[in-house]
Every structure is written in C-alpha cells, then in structure tokens.
C-alpha cells in the first residue's frame, strides 16, 4: 500500500477556510482486504470453479504439493491483506469493522473527508453499499448530513455497462456534502438492465423520496431496489405507510 497524505500532496487544496476538493469522481476498488485460498488457486487453475467441494479441496492440495512457490506467494499475500485489514478497521472509517472490510467502504468515507463543504461526489458503487451492514454508518451519515442529487441503479447484464461481473447491480451516485433542507428528497432511478432501458429511463423523472421516508424504510438506512415501473413505486409508497410487522428484524422493510 502506497500511503498518501492529501494535505501534504495538495496543500493548495487543503489550506484555507474551505479545504477540500470541489469535485471528487471515482470508481473505487470492489474487493475485500482478504485473500481466499480457493479464489487464489482458481486464478492459477480456472477449472477449480467447476469442481465439487471435495474435488476442489483435493485439487488444491495437489497444486500446493506441486507448486511450493505459489504456496509461499499465497502466504505473503495473506500477510499483506491482514495488515491492510487492520489499517482499515483501525482507521477513520466508522462501521467498516462489521465483517471482512471492503475497500469501497473505506473509499466512501475518504471521498467524504476530502471533498469540500458543498462539494460534489460522483462515484460508482456496488449494490452492497446501499444495503450492507458494513456500509450502514456511512449511509446514515450521508443521508443525515448530505444531499443526494441522484442514485441510479443498473444491472450489468451481458456487461452492457462495465466490463466486469455481469451479475452485479451497480449504483451510480451523485452526492453533495451539503446539509439536507427541510424538504430535501433523494432521487432514485432504475435498475436498468440494458443501454436502451438506461437511455429511456434517464429521460423520465426519477422517483423522489423525502429524507424522512428514507430514514424510516429500515433501521439500517438501506435503499430499496424497485422495478422502474410507476405502479411498483406507487405500491411501495403505500406499503411504507403501513405499520411494521417487525422492527426488530435486521434489514426488514416497513411492510
């Protein structure tokens, strides 16, 4: 890991009363600070993923016997990952200690820390950023202290949006470090499963929810993934007006 102290690297940006960047744009790494044994060996022997659990364990044992150099490399990578994990969990990234830390969770906080007051953040995040326990603290902070200009979800079917895992659902986020007003709303679009759906959808008005509504959806400030049809949005709004069946179930919706 190559450390960077932003005030030292960009003194002209962080000196003065209004410190920080006016705009932050990024696509942070989506990976855990952890090296999985089977994932490591799958990179060197792609056929592992098609094997049963027992077959995979036997093949890995065979590979470990044949390739002591890779066994050493895996051990070294795990040590580095453990150190990185400790840095993340002990850093200024509230909530990241829930489970194995994801790098994107730390980057979310870093974006917020380096952008100026009233500055804008435009980033690409995995769906988990809007629902996982590890991202709850950031969601809560952003909803209560920021202004979401737009959140658009896309399903990366056939890799139409990004050359990456086609099963991913991705959030395109536009957020300002500006306190929400009394009547502030959060605009949500999608999910769009193709370029055609996306181009048609962004021409329409987004679904808008008040900050108060977002706070009341779940106890962990999770964002819903709804069908883009108007009827689905309307039905969701009616369901949210009903008393909760249970407020004690983690991530439970107000239905």
Over which residues does each language-model region extend?
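Polynucleotide-recognition surfaces of large bacterial nucleic-acid defense/processing enzymes
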Residues: 1-23, 28-94, 114-116, 149-152, ...
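Phosphate/oxyanion-binding active-site loops and adjacent basic polyanion-contact surfaces
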Residues: 2-6, 96-108
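Alpha-helix N-cap/helix-initiation motif
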Residues: 96-100, 131, 162
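Class I S-adenosyl-L-methionine
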Residues: 107, 131-138
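Phosphate/ATP-binding catalytic cores across multiple sugar-kinase/actin-like superfamilies
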Residues: 107-115
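Short, surface-exposed basic-aromatic patches at helix termini and helix-loop junctions that form
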Residues: 113, 139-145
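Glycine-centered, small-residue-biased loops immediately flanking beta-strands
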Residues: 119
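Conserved short loop/turn motifs at secondary-structure junctions
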Residues: 125-130, 159
